[in-house]
Swiss-Prot record:
Protein name, entry field: Aspartate--tRNA(Asp/Asn) ligase
One Pfam family hit: tRNA-synt_2
Annotated site (Important for tRNA non-discrimination): 30
Catalytic activity: tRNA(Asx) + L-aspartate + ATP = L-aspartyl-tRNA(Asx) + AMP + diphosphate
Positions of ATP binding: 223-225, 232, 499, 551-554
PANTHER family registered for this protein in UniProt: ASPARTATE--TRNA LIGASE, MITOCHONDRIAL (PTHR22594:SF5), ASPARTYL/LYSYL-TRNA SYNTHETASE (PTHR22594)
Species whose genome carries this gene: Prochlorococcus marinus (strain MIT 9303)
Top EC class for this record: ligase
InterPro entries (UniProt xref): Aa-tRNA-synt_II, aa-tRNA-synth_II, aa-tRNA-synth_II/BPL/LPL, Asp-tRNA-ligase_1, Asp-tRNA-ligase_1_N, Asp/Asn-tRNA-synth_IIb, AspRS_core, GAD-like_sf
Length: 606
């Protein structure tokens, strides 16, 4: 049907007869000659229809609508010198048509323009409702082709490293310790339910027990959670697991994987190895375990300097076991007014969204003089002021913003304010050259965090992470006592403030796995019910193993420069977890529900 793709034609094809297929991007009549921009996935080529080639051919071209599907036959020839279009890869040539067949006309009204020449923004809701049309747009086609290149590159790298791709079940059982599951009722096993996998975590560990040694999968995962711009109810992970490798070997292999992807897709040589921060270092310096290191304004813990200060907001927070931290805004005196920091201001609101009651501030003037509210200025002695300015590095013209209270709240508030000001003040460079891809491994996470509402420990990552050997010791009788304070052999890869993926070494000792499950409050009987198949496997010669998973939707979002992963997925859901094109989810018939022995108790409020 076609001999060439539209976008592949070049000067070397001059004098060749070609057959092309594609969509009419636009059609225009210039002085009795019709020019058709014919578009397919590969690009666009100019078709020239001359009346000298035949009246019927010319008449057919005159009646074409945009997005009509065509087959064109013709001769490749050079464009006149004054008609060369340097913006197109095919801009030095055109095809003189000698045949035109409409393969499918457009009979309905187009909801929006697809043409590469029309950059008019289209509302996302309209794009998602007519996604089949939206996918023809150059931007979306380019994004999906880049996604393909990214995944293809990852597959080739892993296969060259001895990994094999194995598919794991999509219908599995529901397990605790995660987001909500998507549940699927079983018709055959009445009253019982499958769950769609949130990750292939347990199956990939079982593959290691099964002796496969190196596994990967481009896995579909499902989580019933509240959505953001970078979240979807169904998403794609590059899932990797390997036996007989320590943490250092795993990190180095995956650095090479990421570097290979960036080289293939962006043509960039990433500097290796990636920097590393421990979890505690990241929290102390940035207030988050996924810091954006492209700009400064790091957090400073000034609790030791201000613990005896007469300003009770500060000294009281420290006495209660909390902390006082600050960030220094360069030239903040000129850039930020008091109104923005006080209640109702945008900076105040950012801190409040993170749970803080507000922010205190100091303005540094000439000769190291300071301005602030009286309660701070009057209670800050000369020694404290000198120590504060020295530790923060603040100089004349700078603004110091303080958070005081529970350390977790202070970290969260100042992290949010730091990110907000980084964007507002233009501290984050916009051109993405090699220096601005700031990769970072965060390592040595705590094994557990406290769930204050339920007054119990929860696994910070998941309950299958192996604890640090030095923290745990070799005496199984002491493990229960040591586990709550242990670090996990876990690691996350962060890029420019976004988590790309994470993983850990896994527990391969059955008794240790039981004790970890008990530490998070799972009774032994329930642990055996939920995870008995895993514990049984660990008792049958499980090798040391570990791995990680990368969020491919997010990686592609960053590589394309998009703001939302919805623009890197062919058929995404909205933030209400709906597909506007197919109108999913939708109701089902009573007969279907009866077969499943399921009854809906939902009542339409209208």
């Amino acid at each position: 049907m076609r001999s060439n793709s539209c976008g592949e034609l070049r000067s070397k094809h001059i004098a060749s007869n070609v057959q092309l297929c594609g969509w009419v991007d636009r059609c225009r009549d210039h002085g009795g000659v019709i020019f058709i921009d014919l578009r397919d996935r590969s690009g666009t080529i100019q078709i020239t229809v001359d009346p000298d080639q035949g009246a019927e051919l010319f008449a057919s071209a005159e009646s074409l609508r945009n997005e009509t599907v065509l087959q064109i036959t013709g001769l490749v020839r050079p464009r006149p010198a004054d008609a060369i279009n340097s913006k197109l890869s095919t801009g030095e040539i055109e095809v003189l048509a000698d045949g035109l067949e409409v393969l499918n006309p457009v009979t309905g009204n187009l909801p929006f323009t697809v043409s590469i020449h029309d950059e008019e923004p289209v509302k996302e809701e309209l794009r998602l409702r007519h996604r089949h049309l939206d996918l023809r747009r150059e931007r979306m086609s380019r994004n999906l082709q880049l996604r393909h290149t990214t995944i293809k590159t990852a597959r080739r790298f892993l296969e060259d490293e001895g990994f094999i791709e194995v598919e794991t079940p999509v219908l599995t059982r529901s397990t605790p310790e995660g987001a909500r599951d998507y549940l699927v009722p079983s018709r055959v096993c009445s009253g019982e339910w499958f769950a769609l996998p949130q990750s292939p975590q347990l199956f990939k560990q079982l593959l290691m027990v099964g002796g496969l040694e190196r596994y990967y999968q481009v896995a579909r995962c499902f989580r019933d959670e509240d959505l953001r711009a970078d979240r979807q109810p169904e998403f794609t992970q590059l899932d990797i697991e390997m036996s007989f490798m320590d943490q250092e070997q795993i990190l180095k292999l995956n650095e090479r994987l990421i570097a290979t992807i960036w080289k293939a897709v962006k043509g960039i040589d990433l500097p290796l190895p990636f920097p590393r921060l421990t979890w505690h270092e990241a929290m102390d310096r940035y207030g988050t375990d996924r810091p954006d290191t492209r700009y400064g304004m790091e957090l400073n813990d000034v609790s030791d300097i201000l613990k005896d200060m007469g300003f009770k907001v500060f000294s009281g927070a420290i006495a209660a076991g909390g902390s006082v931290k600050c960030i220094t805004v360069p030239n903040g005196n000129d850039l930020i007014s008091n109104v923005r920091i006080k209640p109702g201001g945008d900076i105040f609101n950012e801190a409040q969204k993170a749970g803080a009651g507000g922010l205190a501030f100091i303005r540094v003037r000439d000769s190291d003089e300071i301005d602030s509210i009286g309660a701070i200025k009057d209670n800050l002695n000369s020694k404290q002021k000198t120590a504060l300015l020295k530790q923060t590095g603040a100089k004349a013209g700078d603004l110091i913003l303080f958070g005081a209270g529970k350390t977790a709240t202070v970290n969260s508030a100042l992290d949010r304010v730091r990110q907000f000001l980084g964007r507002e003040l233009g501290l984050i460079p916009t051109d993405q050259d090699n220096k601005l891809w700031q990769f970072l491994w965060v390592v040595d996470f705590p094994m557990f965090e406290l769930n204050a509402e339920e007054n119990r420990l929860e696994a910070l990552h998941h309950p299958f992470c192996a604890p640090n050997k030095d923290d745990l010791g070799n005496d199984p009788d002491a493990w229960m006592e040591r586990l709550p304070q242990a670090r996990a052999q876990a690691y996350d890869l962060v890029l420019n403030g976004l988590e790309l993926g994470g993983g850990s070494l896994r527990i391969h000792n059955a008794e240790l796995q039981r004790q970890v499950l008990q530490t998070i409050g799972l009774p032994l009987e329930e642990a055996n019910q939920q995870f008995g198949f895993l514990i049984d496997a660990l008792e049958m010669g499980a090798p040391p193993h570990g791995g990680l998973a990368f969020g491919m939707d997010r990686i592609v979002m960053l590589l394309t420069g998009e703001d939302s992963i919805r623009d890197t997925i062919a058929f995404p859901k909205t933030q209400q977890a709906r597909c506007l094109m197919t109108q999913a989810p939708a109701g089902v018939s009573n007969h279907q529900l009866e077969e499943l022995h399921v009854e809906s108790t939902w009542v339409d409020p209208e």
